Design a protein with these regions (language model features):
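N-terminal active-site wall of soluble small-molecule enzyme domains
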Residues: 1-57, 61-70
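Active-site loop/helix belt of alpha/beta enzymes
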Residues: 1-13, 68, 72-73, 79-82, ...
């Protein structure tokens, strides 16, 4: 299960951060004594924002509603909520749409500007990294374009930029950036 794997990763291998799909998985790890930073990659309903803050989790954000809920929950707790912003570079699932880098950068900057949030990272996910190299590289370029717009227009940079999951870790070292998943 997840708990023995997380313990081995944290206590024996010393990984910097863990990532899970949902709040329930993160809560299970915290309950088991895992203290490493945990990033929730999936969506969390805004009504559970206080749980994210109370457990000291980092939440993926791609909607104003969730960003506002996290900001309010963190403010009420006297804390800052760690967030990673999701950029949709072609998966067509979640995130600021990168096919318009200026618009995506504006949307992301507005989310980051909310009080009581601590923007730690930004990421995308490749649709077919184990298949279509051309499309994977197009997605990577789109992601870099959004990052460039964020820095040039808003002076915003991120400590952690990531996009490489399993297939990209093996096939595309140039996509590793600051973290792999």
């Amino acid at each position: 299960g997840a708990v023995p794997v997380a313990r081995a990763l944290e206590w024996e291998l010393g990984v910097d951060q863990l990532a899970v799909a949902c709040l329930e998985e993160a809560a299970e790890l915290r309950k088991a004594g895992i203290t490493a930073p945990i990033l929730i990659l999936g969506y969390t309903q805004p009504e559970f924002a206080a749980d994210v803050v109370d457990l000291g989790l980092t939440q993926t954000v791609f909607t104003p509603e969730l960003a506002r809920a996290l900001s309010e929950a963190a403010g009420a707790a006297g804390k800052r909520a760690g967030i990673h912003l999701k950029v949709d570079t072609g998966m067509s699932r979640l995130g600021a749409l990168a096919h318009e880098p200026e618009s995506a950068a504006r949307e992301i900057d507005a989310l980051c500007a909310l009080p009581h949030l601590r923007p730690e990272g930004i990421f995308t996910h490749f649709a077919d990294a184990d298949g279509d190299e051309g499309y994977t590289m197009l997605q990577f370029t789109r992601f870099l374009d959004v990052l460039a717009q964020l820095e040039e227009k808003y002076g915003r940079t991120f400590e952690i930029r990531h996009c490489a999951a399993s297939a990209a870790v093996l096939k595309y070292p140039c996509t590793h950036l600051d973290m792999v998943r």
